[in-house]
Regions:
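Conserved beta-strand positions in repeat-built beta-propeller and related beta-rich domains
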Residues: 90-102, 137-142, 186-190, 235-244, ...
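Blade-level signature of beta-propeller repeat domains, shared across WD40, Kelch, NHL, RCC1
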Residues: 392-400, 404-425
Length: 425
């Protein structure tokens, strides 16, 4: 791999979750993010109002007329329908977001496991999140929007299923949401703050500054994931930095714990390893999955510098419970099903920059790791419900389910883009 390609990969790899495939990294760095594909309020769609946060903790810095903790005007772009919809509303199993790294689309999965023929267009780098009833599309760096959608109206109403859409500061890069009743915390990976918004209208209710946790010279600690449990908000920070030659430095990750109601900082805990990817609360205990540093092949080594950490909040300590030696490398993504977690292990990338990954099933309490055969690229994300695992396998490309014994490939509609993100209701 030549020096320019190495620089391109290193430049963007640190800006997103470790699970992103190198193909997307090359495209976004070389071409720039397309910010014109997000939804907006036009015609007879819901009208969106600008709003600001009057909370004392809100940011006072300004960028293009918006504070870094504010939700601004509706995006100037629009949702596009790829085909007409029927007039029958349906209950859904979940949604799948597809991307070819230049365009992105949202499709939905009905109770029979069929993916919709119709789709809505969004920014090519987006994440779908649900709270069990509503759907949210986080359009990431380059579009920087949050869109709430009524899933029951998707099939019958198409783009009119949009309830509201709000625009964030440029390059705020929303990456996750954690729901707290009729409000939700939003992680902004490239900003110096977290915001709490109303799920009714998207208006900011609270903002907390996190820039003090950034690595020296950086403005953001680069939040990778957030989790809300029993009144506490767990904020996972990667805290990397990059020099002018695109060389990335990863210090050990940091877990910050906030009061989910007030936004007050309760504690911080230094992790044992670097480049964390996911945080989860399992059986009252906090666990963190870490990817660690990349090796020369842009994969990860099977060593003790990465794995699954168990965090002892009361003692402010973290221990490496299951190492990369047991897993075969670093964790790109993790989903939880009771005491069992499924993790995708980053092994590297092929000559076409497609991810090469291994899928592992981990029994947390027994510290037992098992291989799940037949999956080679989970960079289209994973989701799980009642023991049924959904994998966005971009090597197929399709959404593939696994019930612990048998795989089933969900048929892709003609022209559907490869899976990039999955969320279940």
């Amino acid at each position: 791999m030549n020096k320019m390609k190495k620089n391109v990969i290193a430049s963007v790899a640190k800006q997103s979750f470790a699970a992103l495939s190198i193909a997307s990294l090359v495209f976004m760095t070389a071409c720039g993010d397309d910010s014109s594909s997000g939804p907006s309020s036009t015609g007879d769609e819901p009208e969106l109002s600008s709003s600001s946060n009057d909370d004392e903790g809100s940011s006072s810095s300004k960028k293009k007329g918006k504070s870094s903790s504010s939700v601004g005007e509706a995006s100037s772009s629009s949702v596009e329908e790829s085909s007409s919809s029927s007039e029958i509303s349906v209950s859904l199993t979940g949604v799948v977001f597809g991307s070819d790294y230049s365009t992105g689309e949202l499709r939905w999965i009905d109770k029979d496991g069929k993916i919709s023929e119709s789709s809505l267009s969004f920014h090519q780098d987006s994440k779908v999140v649900t709270n069990g009833a509503d759907l949210y599309v986080l359009e990431r760096k380059g579009a920087d929007n949050i869109t709430k959608i009524d899933p029951e109206k998707l099939e019958s109403k198409g783009k009119k299923a949009v309830v509201w859409q709000v625009s964030l500061d440029d390059e705020a890069n929303p990456v996750d949401m954690a729901f707290d009743g009729d409000q939700a915390w939003v992680a902004l990976q490239n900003a110096d703050s977290l915001v709490k918004i109303s799920t009714e209208d998207g208006k900011v209710k609270k903002s907390i500054k996190i820039g003090k946790f950034a690595y020296e010279g950086e403005h953001s600690p680069y939040v990778a994931d957030i989790e809300l449990d029993d009144g506490s908000l767990y904020v996972l920070m990667q805290r990397y930095t990059q020099d002018e030659n695109y060389v990335v430095t990863y210090p050990k990750g940091l877990l910050a714990i906030y009061d989910a109601s007030t936004g007050d900082l309760k504690d911080t805990i230094q992790l044992k390893s670097k480049n964390p990817s996911n945080v989860a609360v399992i059986g009252g205990n906090v666990y963190v999955a870490t990817h660690g540093e990349y090796n020369a092949a842009y994969g990860t080594d099977a060593d003790s510098q990465r794995g699954i950490e168990k965090v002892n909040v009361s003692k402010k300590k973290s221990e490496l419970l299951i190492s990369g030696e047991d897993l075969g490398g670093g964790i790109a993504s993790m989903v939880v099903d009771g005491e069992v977690v499924y993790v995708s292990i980053n092994l590297g990338y092929d000559e076409n920059y497609a991810a090469i990954q291994a899928l592992k099933k981990v029994d947390i309490s027994a510290k037992k790791v098992d291989d799940v055969e037949g999956f080679t690229d989970m960079s289209g994300s994973m989701a799980i419900d009642d023991g049924l695992l959904y994998v966005g396998d971009r090597s197929v490309p399709a959404v593939v389910t696994w019930n612990g014994k048998k795989k089933n490939t969900i048929k892709q509609p003609k022209g559907a883009l490869p899976p990039y993100n999955i969320a279940l209701f």
